[in-house]
Amino acid sequence: MKRFLILTPMVLALCGCESPALLVQKDDAEFAPPANLVQPATVTEGGGLFQPAYNWSLLQDRRAYRIGDILTVILDESTQSSKQAKTNFGKKNDMSLGVPEVLGKKLNKFGGSISGKRDFDGSATSAQQNMLRGSITVAVHQVLPNGVLVIRGEKWLTLNQGDEYMRVTGLVRADDVARDNSVSSQRIANARISYAGRGALSDANSAGWLTRFFNHPLFPI
């Protein structure tokens, strides 16, 4: 009993101190541009119309397909889900005991009946809708042997009440990149899109430790 009284406050304290999410930091090395892969252009003399140092051809496709190239991701995400469940069951038991007789005399005190009934009725409804619109410019960090581009990038907005950030990673086919170096987020495979913030506004939308304490799955009520 004493051990239970000691462990219960410790478990409940851990439930309330649980962090809702890891704090995201700026200048993450994972999202840094691949600057070490950019080679300086060789400066050579040329004519007035043609400059060899400017590595571009009239017939060359300017869409992103190399490491270090830049492309813009058009965010067009919309999800909607709903779920409904209903369960009910019941159980009823009846049992009666007759009055026994001993030597021709009825023992009324030993007679009676037993009955039991249990009912359960539960229902649940869940609905969720998310929408994300906007754009973010990312860099090509790797080109796979089959030509698929590994893209990664982030955007930070510093506001007067905190910071907001957006991060995008995933795989893009070079054929899905438009001529203006843009690609829809719906064309990104293994997409990881994060949009959140930190600061006063983010803290106002986050549940406090006491709320998380009462809403934790280990809470007995």
Curated annotation (Swiss-Prot):
The keyword Signal applies. A lipid is attached at residue 17 (S-diacylglycerol cysteine). It comes from the Bacteria. The basal body constitutes a major portion of the flagellar organelle and consists of four rings (L,P,S, and M) mounted on a central rod. Keywords: Bacterial flagellum, Cell outer membrane, Lipoprotein, Membrane, Palmitate, Signal. It comes from Yersinia pseudotuberculosis serotype I (strain IP32953). GO terms for molecular function: cytoskeletal motor activity. It is a lipid-anchor. Its main location: membrane. Pfam families: FlgH. Assembles around the rod to form the L-ring and probably protects the motor/basal body from shearing forces during rotation. GO terms for cellular component: bacterial-type flagellum basal body, distal rod, L ring; cell outer membrane. Residues 1-16 form the signal peptide. This is Flagellar L-ring protein 2. GO terms for biological process: bacterial-type flagellum-dependent cell motility. It is found in: Cell outer membrane; Bacterial flagellum basal body.
